[in-house]
């Protein structure tokens, strides 16, 4: 999770900030549910970029957190690359606060270094939609898999019979996909009846 900082979040204009924040937290919660090794990093946190948003640091109090004093691309920071290598993973799920810089730069570098990179575009953002589209196109051309957080979550769950993660995954969908929550509520009403209306339960 790259540069999701209080200051830089304000620069995202191609998606509502409330939706953007929700997407980032959904991805973070998914990583937590599946016990994925997670790395946080921030650029120039003591300046206008600001601190990492507190929801992330609260979710991952023990995660490696790399504060970069200079490098714009996280992959240009030796500590960040060392933290990635220490996970032992060859597949990387990456998101950065800005798609065209914070995500695309390290994603391209990681791909060139031999990693299988999944770039989560809706947990990243841009100044405008054209910049977002061009950045995603460039990553796809390089062989990076550009996906959204819901696809990542569903892919990791894969089967609702995986009981150790199913409840957590369902909760993430309920919290961060409004239509899914409404659908579930509607189903429960049909199944259990609507209180006060004396509607029959389905046996």
Name each model-derived stretch:
Residues 23-26, 79, 102-103:
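Well-ordered alpha-helical segments embedded in enzymatic catalytic cores
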Residues 1-65, 69-70, 86, 133-140, ...:
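Active-site acidic carboxylates
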Residues 13, 49, 77, 103, ...:
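Alpha-helix N-cap/helix-start motif
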Residues 52-55, 79, 105-109:
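A short acidic, amphipathic alpha-helical/loop segment
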Residues 91-149:
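A contiguous pocket-lining binding segment that forms or flanks enzyme active sites
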Residues 83-90:
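Glycine-rich phosphate-binding loop signature in dinucleotide/nucleotide-binding domains
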């Amino acid at each position: 999770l790259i540069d999701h900082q209080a200051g830089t979040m304000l620069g995202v204009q191609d998606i509502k900030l409330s939706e953007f924040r929700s997407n980032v937290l959904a991805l973070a919660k998914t990583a937590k549910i599946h016990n994925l090794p997670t790395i946080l990093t921030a650029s120039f946190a003591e300046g206008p970029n600001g601190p990492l948003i507190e929801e992330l640091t609260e979710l991952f109090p023990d995660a490696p957190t790399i504060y970069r004093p200079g490098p714009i691309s996280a992959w240009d920071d030796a500590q960040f690359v060392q933290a990635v290598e220490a996970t032992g993973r060859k597949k990387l799920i990456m998101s950065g606060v800005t798609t065209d810089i914070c995500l695309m730069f390290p994603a391209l570098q990681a791909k060139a270094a031999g990693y299988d990179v999944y770039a989560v575009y809706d947990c990243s953002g841009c100044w405008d939609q054209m910049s977002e589209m061009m950045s995603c196109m460039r990553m796809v051309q390089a062989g990076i898999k550009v996906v959204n957080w819901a696809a990542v979550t569903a892919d990791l769950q894969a089967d609702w019979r995986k009981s150790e993660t199913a409840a957590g995954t369902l909760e993430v969908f309920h919290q961060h996909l409004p239509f899914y929550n409404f659908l579930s509520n509607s189903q429960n009403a049909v199944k259990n009846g609507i209180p006060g209306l004396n509607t029959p339960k389905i046996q």
